[in-house]
């Protein structure tokens, strides 16, 4: 049976609730991604192309009941507590208190659904760790097509002053993803463009090339990717190893400057290293060097705003803060994504020792010249029912609402680093930048 699909809300907003003081939001995550495929979501612009026909991104069923990941037994809990620095315990206590108070306010003032009905495609599988070879002829079955494609590219070789690839309206054919790696791919149109890419079923892109040269016919089919209006992306491995960091200045081509930079770094984490979803960077130090380099070269001086997602790991949070501070920025806000069930209950204990039901986005900007002392950090809560692994709430609507007024909305420049989907009007970069713009993810 085909999945039941509910269109994106007609008011063109993923915000299901917001408090009067704008410190508390309920945000539908799939809708936030779907609406980010169109320019100026929050501007109310009447001329936005086909917004009434916004596609719906496939999702997973919402969580219905909370769970606990706490250590079993008093001894295990004590060992975990002893491993956490006292400053981290104090920070978690502050966050937990703020979240509890905010959730209490939400239950008082909001009566409604915490997420919209989701389009769930049961045959859509996330890609496995390794792709097996497909033998035989080039015919591909429907079952194979329902698997998320392998988007891996070969090792990046940066090319200074490489010209951008400007997409034509409609369908653009590509021989493979390697043909566009490290190239700025632009859709200058007010309508979405399509990339149609040849995709081989082998375990290695290098193996594809070798067997092509040997004259063998490799099984393949084409994958389609949607490029939103006025979006630009760079498909690339961001340099995180020390011997590659000197190549950083030429990644973004001719010193492109942005008003807003959003980063979701692949923080080193044992559980993530065991996962098949993505590889993490080798060390926090290497990652900090990369983050600082991007901020120093690509964030607009004086008025630019940077935002870095962190995990509930003291090292990721300190690295994010140090990256902002070492780039001349000052932390001024924290946005706390609280993960809840469909009924608005946190998915795990707020004061959990092993895992917390929230992630924190740290925002920084240049300090005011008239500022004599460190300002109070403003906190906001974004309540959202988790989606599939690695998807976060898309923040375009909130960013535009808080930082770019109607006069400036038309011309601000934004960049998402380590992106997993494209955004209308923004630049995006990373080795998974096309992942959720694969046509198979969309109803």
Predicted regions and their residues:
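Helix-to-beta-strand junctions that scaffold the AdoMet/dcAdoMet cofactor pocket
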Residues: 295-302
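Conserved beta-strand signature within the Rossmann-like core of class I S-adenosyl-L-methionine
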Residues: 302-311
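Class I S-adenosyl-L-methionine
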Residues: 1-263, 267-292, 313-443
